[in-house]
Amino acid sequence: FIVALVTGILLLIWYSPSVNGAYDSVLAMQQSPYLVELLRSLHRYSSDVCILFIILHAFQMLGARKFGGARWVAWLSGMLLLGLVWMDGWTGYWLVWDERARQIALGTANFLDVLPFFPEPLLRSFLTNDGLNSLFFFIVFFIHMLIPMGVVAFLWIHIMRLNAARFFTSVRMGLALLGVLIITSLMFPATLAAPADMTVVPQDLQIDWLFMMPLWFTERLSGSVLWVALFFTTVALWGIPWWLTKGNPEPAVVNEASCNGCTQCVQDCPFNAIDMIDLEEPRSGITEFARVNLDKCVGCGVCVGSCDSSSINQSTIPVMDVRKFVSQLEEDVRHVAFICAESAGERFPIDENGSCEALPGYRVVPVSCVGWVHMLTIERALRRGAEGVLVAGCGVDPACRSGADYTGSRLAGDREPWLRVDHVDPS
């Protein structure tokens, strides 16, 4: 997105936003010094990569089922981002005003003519070359310039509920992507079709399927059918957080009377779902307490593993009950395993006694996220006779973002609350 934005701004130096001058200005770019042609190719390919990554990210979230509960805001804003980026690419191809732009203009007019906003059908403006409206062309140019502002706004909405959200990839990955884009642009420069002629139907037109796939529909369906298809597609995509969610985990609850206001849960919550509230009557030096925002909480339980005072709980898996459960080991069961319910715990059947055929000799506790596991729970199991404790979390795509990393840091003594090595044998 950044590459497309920067190159697009630079291309304004050479581009003429008028129906009569657009094609000639783009043709001049293609025939001008090497740098300008490279900028145009970078603009085109970076746009393709941008929408491709958005689509892949959407499928990743869909496959990982990261769309239910409080995540619905991220899902809907993500769908809007996808639509905005596609629209920016659609209008961008229009601004070239070649044969591909001709088909885009006719398809758009076919789609918009259903609306009762226009005094006369838009298609009439594209019957002849003389009927082309320069003002309408400039409006398309203005929309193309305005959409990136909407992308930035919805991107903020998309990630505003994430704690320590990352806007950019690593420097190494960013440079690698830029290098690939530059090499691709040099080897396969962006093409330019023949100039748009409203009286001639282009033959064997090569299109960019990532942005121009709707042309297949606009050339075959009426505007009314297109609107109906768009409506049901939008409802289907936007309804995924409610239609495909099996059930949302119970949110965390804070016992405000015992909260000591340490703020560790606020620092650890992956989804910014905890706020510190001022006490009306401070007690023993404590001036604030934690409160879970139920509209943001996804029920990951990472805050439970952060709370030294055991003031945060989930009704489905109370901390004290689990500590008692792992303390009462049988003679043939001398190990304890905390398994993420979103990964291994979902695949292995575990009975109410904590027995699992895949882990003989272990008392298995499925948890919403391994970040739920407080170090005191591990210490208690080891002090009460457990010969070892296994903590198995998610793989490369954690269901609850940083929960597994936090647990690893706590076990290593790099993050509070850490495992007290003087109380147990960490080996």
Model-derived segments and spans:
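Membrane-interfacial segments at transmembrane helix termini in multi-pass membrane proteins
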Residues: 247-257, 313-325
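Short Cys/His-rich Zn2+-coordinating modules
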Residues: 240-253, 278-280, 284-290
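Iron-sulfur-associated redox domains of electron-transfer enzymes in respiratory
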Residues: 79, 93, 104-107, 318-427
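Membrane-cytosol interface motif
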Residues: 251-270
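Iron-sulfur cluster-binding cysteine motifs and their immediate structural context
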Residues: 264-323
